[in-house]
C-alpha cells in the first residue's frame, strides 16, 4: 500500500468519526428533560421551542442524517465537509463585518481613516480578514470567481468612500442578505443530489443482493467502512477527551492509586452508550491483536509474519467482553458500579490474552527444544516468555484475592490463571527434557512415555481445578442466590472443562494401554532374524538392533510401532489390522468355524487380506531386502479380455475357491483357451516373492 492509499484510508476513517460521535450524542440526549429545562428558562416564549413534536421529529432526522453521513462514499463525504467549511468561512466573514461596523458605531468617527490611527488599524484588520476568508472560500469551492464570496467587503469599501455610519449599517445588512441568497441558490441547485445518490445507491445495492446475496453485501460494507478501526478511533477520541477534561479541571498532582481509579472510571464513562461499548470492544480486540503479534515477533522475529500474515486473533477477547457486558447490563449501571464490574471483565480478558499467548509460545518453545538450534538468543527469548507467563498469572490471581471478595466469577478468573501457570510448567519441563536429550550422546529411553506422564500430570491438575470450580459454583447456587446466568455458566463450564477433558483423557489412556498390550503380544525378533531381514525400520528409517514382528511379518522398532499404534491400529506398511491378545483369541475362535480356514492358511487368497486370514509364516519364507534385490524383475502384460476374465474368476474364487493361487488361475485360463502364453509374459517367481505379492 502506497502513501496515497494510506492517506485515503486514514481520511476514510477520520471523515466518518463525527457521524459516530453525533449518534452517541443523540443517544445521550434526553428530549423530555431538555424541554422541561426550556420551559423553566426564558426560551419558553420562543416559537421555535413551542412545537415539541417537531423537535422530536428533528431528533429522529438527526439519526437519519448520521447514518447517511456514515454510509456516504468517501468522495461525496469529502465534498460535504468542504461545503460545511465554506459555510463556516462565510459565517466568519459575516462576524468580521459585523464587529467592524459595531466598532465604527461606537467610535463615532466619520472622517478620513489615515488621520485616525485606531480607525486605520480597525480597517486594515477587517480588510485582511475578509481577504483571507474570500481566498479560502474560493479554494474550498474550487472556483476563480472570488467576487461571489466578497459581499462582506462592501461595508469596508463604503467606509473607504467616507459613507455615513448609518448607511454602512444598511450596506452590511444588504451584504448579509446577498450572501444568504447565494447560499439558498446553491442549496436549491443541489436539491436533487441526495435523491439521485439514494437512487443510485439503491440500484447498486439491489444488484449486489441479487447477484451475491445479503451476506456479501454486509461484508462489502464492513470492509469499505472499516468498521473496527472506525469504532476504535471513535472510542480513543472519547477516552482522550475524558482524560483531558479531568486533568484540565485538576490542579493538584494525582497519586498512583488515584491514577488507577481515574483509568477505570474514564473507561467506565466511555461505555455509557451502545456505540461507545462497541468502540471499547474493538479497541480491546486491537490491543489483544497487538499483544499477540508482539509475542510472536518476540519469539520468531520477522519470520512470524511470513507464515502467518493474517494474524486473525484478538476477536475472542473482544467478543468475550461484549458478551459479559451485555449479560451483566454494563451500560445501565452507575459509573462507580460500572467501573467495578469493568475491572472484573478486564481481568477475564487479560486471562484470555495470556492463554492465547501460551497457545502461540507452546509449539514454538517445544520445537526449539527438539531442534538442534544452538542460538542462545532464541532460547533466551523462549524461556523468558515462558517465565513471564508463569509468574504474571500467579501475580494476577494474588491481586484479585487481595482486592476483591471471592465469588464464582472471580474463582473462574483465578482458576484460569492457575491453569495457565500449570501449562507453562509442563511446557518448560518438556523443554528441559528435550535439551537434556540434546546434550546426551544417546537418546533418553522411553522419552515419549516421560512426556506423556508430564502432560498427563498437568492435565489431571487442570481437571481437578475445573472440578473444584464446578463444586464451588454448585454449592453457591444451592446455598446462596440462584440465578439463571450462573447456572448456565456452571453447566457450560462443567461440559467443556470437566466432561470433555475427562472423556479425552480416558480415551488417550485406553489407546496407550491398548498399544502397550499389542506391543507385548508381538514376538521379539532374534539376532539371527534381524541379520537375515537386513533392513531398516520403516517408521524412523534407522537400523534395527531390536525389533518386533507383526502378524504380517514386518519388522519395526518397538517404540516406533507403539507411537504408530497411538494413532491407528494398522500396520504402517500393509495396513493390516493389529489386534491385542484378547482380540486375536476372539478372531481365532471365529475363524475356526470357517470350513476353508485350513486352505486359506496354506494358500492365502488373492485380493485384500484381513488379520484373521493372515498366519505367521516361517521366517525363512519371508523375503528379505537382499533376496529381493537379487531376484529378476517381473514384466507383466495382460490383454483387456484376459483382465476381464481374471476379475470374473476372482469373483468366483471368493465364493468358495479361495485356495487357488496365481499359477492355478493362469492354468485355468490357458485350459479354457482364453489366455495365450504371448498374452501373459510372466516369469516364474520364487515361493517367497509369490507369497509377498499375494499379501
Curated annotation (Swiss-Prot):
A zinc finger (RING-type) spans 537-575. It holds the Pfam family zf-RING_2. The chain crosses the membrane at residues 53-73, 77-97, 123-143, 146-166, 168-188, 225-245, 275-295, 316-336, 340-360, 384-404, 410-430, 460-480, 482-502. Coiled coil: none annotated. Signal peptide: none annotated. GO terms for cellular component: membrane. It is a multi-pass membrane protein. Its main location: membrane. Residues 585-610 are annotated as: Disordered. Residues 585-603 have a biased composition (Polar residues). It is found in: Membrane. This is RING finger protein 145. It comes from Xenopus tropicalis.
